[in-house]
Amino acid sequence: MFTLLTLCALFAETITIYPDHHSRVFSAHEKPVAHVHSGDTVITKTWDSGGQDEKGVRHLQQPYVYPESGNPLMGPFYIEEADRDDSLEVHLDKVRLNRNWGYTSYRLSPETLGPGAAESSYKNFYKMDAVRPQRADLIPWDLDLEHKIASPRLLQKSAYRFSLPVNPMLGCIGVATAGDEILTSGPAGSYGGNMDYNDVIEGATLLFPVYHKGAYFYLGDGHALQGDGEGLGTGIETSLDVQFTVKVRKGKTLSIPRLINEDYIISIGSQPEFHSNTDYALRMANSDMLKWLTTEYHLTAPEANLLMGTVVKHKIVTYFGTVATLIPRKYLSR
């Protein structure tokens, strides 16, 4: 007998939606921009962190100021079959650049450096409002869409040829937070959020806990490129074309987000930014990985501990709150 989810997969639809409004919170109280079913595919676009779209049109009255506000999000998407204690699987079919410019802050965040290092870095030569209203700390970048190269418009240059291959990613992705709590798209947590994880790229599959009927899925904050840790406090901020497919996993309760790509399975631990060291997020990610290995890959507890102790990798996702625990998939296909 076909289950409801099997029938949804058989009659899956592709929905194209380009919202003319946004949200800045991961909340179940926001009005959905679309109702979709498990198995459906959505084609959409995201604005940059300042609210500008692929044509340079600015959709926000006020600039982003942490933590009172947040990155503009597309969503929420209401997933009809999702309910509390399920998990939501989101496969990123496409994450593509759609304009030829972006921007970053001009130097590393002082909190990422040792005492005195920030002061001896370099002064800001950039003008107020040059890139975004009420911001004087931003550098514009040129994005070569044909060759997929990013280059900063530097005022001070050396002989160094500064051009980098792009790797488009989504900084914000997740579901509505648990209970009645309403969090802006500035922090990250068990629901996802502003994780700024540079493995959230085309081809990745993400898994999120579901805390409310409908899940209320959001995405936004596109980056053309970003290093581990988001040391600048930004990636190369830009707008994106995105296509994703959703699937509900009934009764598959999760405690934190997970990510699967061609090479790794990944547990993502987040904690309130600036409130504690990243060791708490690391412990969350490690604990979830142990559970994943024993419950879904059916390793014994000794096997899971020994595998993690010998082949685990870690990523500092953001310097202020998120850490990823990675296990190579080649050790799990035996």
Enumerate the predicted regions with their spans.
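Intrinsically disordered, low-complexity linker/loop segments enriched in Gly/Pro
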Residues: 96-198
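Short, structured beta-strand/loop micro-motifs enriched in basic residues and often containing a Trp
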Residues: 18-27, 66-73, 183-191
